[in-house]
Amino acid sequence: MASVLLLPHQRRKHRQKRARTASYRKPMSQGSSPSPAMEVDGPEFPGKTGGQTIAEMGEERSGAGTGNTGTGGQSSVSGAGGKAGALNTAKLVLSHKPISTSSPEAMAAAQQVTPQKLAQLLLAKGPLAIRFITQALTEEIPSFKDLSASKQRRLIMGALEAGDQENSVVFAKIGWGQWSARHVKPHLFIKERELTNVANSKVKDAGVHEARRSSSNAKKGGKSGSFLNELKRPMLAAPTASIYIDENALASDDDEEDDEEDEHDMLNYENLKRRQPSVVAVEPPELSDQQEVLFRARLRAPNGGSRRRSTSKVRSVSVSKPGAHRAPPAAGDAVEGPLRRLSPSQADRKSTIDIATPEEPPHDELLSANSVAKTRRAAARRDSWLSRSKESSIRSTLLSHSNYNIVSPPSHAQPPADHHPLGREADHSDTDEEDWASIGAPALRNNSMPSNLSSSSSHHGNSASASNAHSEQGSPHARPLNYAIPNSIPPRQHSPPDAEDAAFLLMSLKS
């Protein structure tokens, strides 16, 4: 018997009922009448006997009452019968299985499914689907409904493919699962049946796919037919446009990668070309920029120690020239800019200390293609990593020390006598705080120098005195600031040792 799940409050009621009827549970015969002692009076059991109460309790607990629990009478039997009948019906429904194909009923039902019966059905009721044919045969054949669905379908399809040879009727599939019957000539029955079966197989294979394809296309077309049509047009022209754009992008990237190595050189070379006219400009600049130009000239004049400071002198010459805005340049001043541009590069190749040549080299040699190209490449490489702010800080710090040699760019071309005094007066008028002409090698030698730079100062004093004597013999107007050595002596002989060079660079970094 099936057990019934009870809730907590129902369990409490059952416990109370069991406690009240515990004393009345005694086996009784079915024909005996209930005793007065078994009558239960109270609000819960009004007018009920003990047997009825016990029977009801048995039904609630187990779902079916039995005669052993008491004198159940008709109520217990009827309750048990109702429950059992419902369960039996459910069991029959669940336990229903199609009959075996080898059973006599199945064989009799299969023999009744004939092409003649199907021909009569289809000719009378028109094209029908398989489900409607199955329903009609179920009504006509008693045992046909007990067969399995697959067995029913196989019987129907076999009869349709065989055809009604007696009546010369063939069955054709017209699509959507519907079948129709048509008469043919008796002598052409076999041929028509074969052709019809081949056509039916094709319709079965292609018809379903076409139906699905058409239905899916119709749904898609109804939702976004026009949108898809619009998208097809740009998609056709998209490959050509994308290829064109990609080719341009690749070409431009290749050009950038090819020019990446010489990027700084080209930019700086163009800047130097644009700045070159400012060196030989005839028209003076505005008065508002003169003070700034003079201040930069003062700061850049004493830079002549290391490669880094000599690099800044190239930038100072390219930006401004002291005599370019004070007076119109003479015939020789036009060459002075490029000459000053060449002197620092030669000094960088020969020594770490800026050494200028006292005599003027040939004009053609100075303006040769190799020297100009080397100078511009060297200046462009150094200017790429050197900033003006760093130059200004180094110059302002080095200017306060009197231990370094102050070397100005040499004048390689002497202007005529009538123009030279004007340039000198302008140079003297530029500085109010100190006279640059009075500063020379003797004044620097008299100053106290650190021990690590003593040899360097004596070396510069000797070279400066020699250059001073040579310049006085060559021209009475020679500037005392230009210190150099004769061309007969190679400049590399005057380069300091490695220890002095290292000490000089260390002092410049500390300052």
Swiss-Prot record:
| Cellular-component GO terms for this entry | cytoplasm; nucleus
Annotated stretches, region: Disordered: 1-82, 206-227, 298-501
Q: List, as start-end ranges, the regions of compositional bias called Low complexity.
A: 446-471
Q: Which InterPro entries match?
A: Stb3 (IPR018818)
Keyword Cytoplasm found: yes
- Quote the biased-composition stretches of kind Basic and acidic residues, using this chain's numbering: 380-393, 417-429
- UniProt xrefs under Pfam families: Stb3
Q: List the biased-composition ranges (Basic residues).
A: 9-20
Recorded family membership: Belongs to the STB3 family.
Q: Report the PANTHER family cross-referenced here.
A: PROTEIN STB3 (PTHR28164:SF1)
Q: Name it.
A: Protein STB3
Q: Organism, per UniProt?
A: Eremothecium gossypii (strain ATCC 10895 / CBS 109.51 / FGSC 9923 / NRRL Y-1056) (Yeast)
